Amino acid sequence: VGLNGVGIKAVNALSESFEIQSFRDGETKYVRYCRAKIVEERKIEPTDQPNGTQVTFFADKDIFGNYHYIAEYLEAMVKNYVFLNTGLTIFFNDHKYYSKRGLYDLLMENMSGEGLYPIIHLKGEDIEMAMTHGRQYGEEYYSFVNGQHTTQGGTHLSAFREAVAKTIRDFYKKDFEISDIRTSIIGAISIKVQEPVFESQTKTKLGSKDIRPDGPTVRNFIMDFVTRELDNYLHRNPDTAELLLRKIVETEKERKAMSGVQKIARERAKQVSLHNRKLRDCRVHFNSNHERKNESSIFITEGDSASGSITKSRDV
């Protein structure tokens, strides 16, 4: 995944030993290569193994020298594979990786603490989503297309974020601020797209507009699914719906309180400190909310004595 269709060719060419064995419909075929040249090839034989492909390779030491694999990087990839393929088992460094609940397990793996309500996990044909809210600031998403981790998002993630916010607004029949809904959200979305188009060679951002030729758009496909399934879930789980509502209301209160603090700070910043002793600031600013702001005036005097008396006698 992520090598733009040349992955197996590149690995074969850069391996001192590359073995591949395919199992299909009760038959198997085995071929072994050395630096992309066939050194052993067996005839098709009967087998009782399930369908699949086994690949074994050793990187060419003449090219890579005393190489080693970065276990943390491979482990992250392996985990994503099992999260996206429920029931798949992968063994890596004598450790078994397996997931029964797909994206639900992915969120559990990546959350720094418990969610504020149980993870909402929904699956459909060619689509799966999971979401909850945590205690962190900002938004956190994991998006996938055909098993590819789109770290930069794309059309599917944009549609997912829009659909979740719209569904929650409609469910509670309240015109919440979008930011209040999304703050602290942790979500994951995975879809399958025919002939996906990515915006870069690294396949980290989906650019596809449609799910398949002559099919719905990515946006409509995700909007329809989330609107229907998330709304149904919230109706069936009133306790979760109540916790979600409480979270949004608390975020709204925090935002308004913070907005008030910021407003006061801005108003204080406008009250410029005048270092020139010839200039005296007025008591009431014209751009303030004071009831006598329209009485504020500018006085220009010739000398310090006149200025001093006016400054002391004014009340605006």
Where are these regions (language model features)?
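Glycine-rich phosphate-binding loop
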Residues: 1
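GHKL-family ATPase ATP-binding module
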Residues: 9-13, 17-316
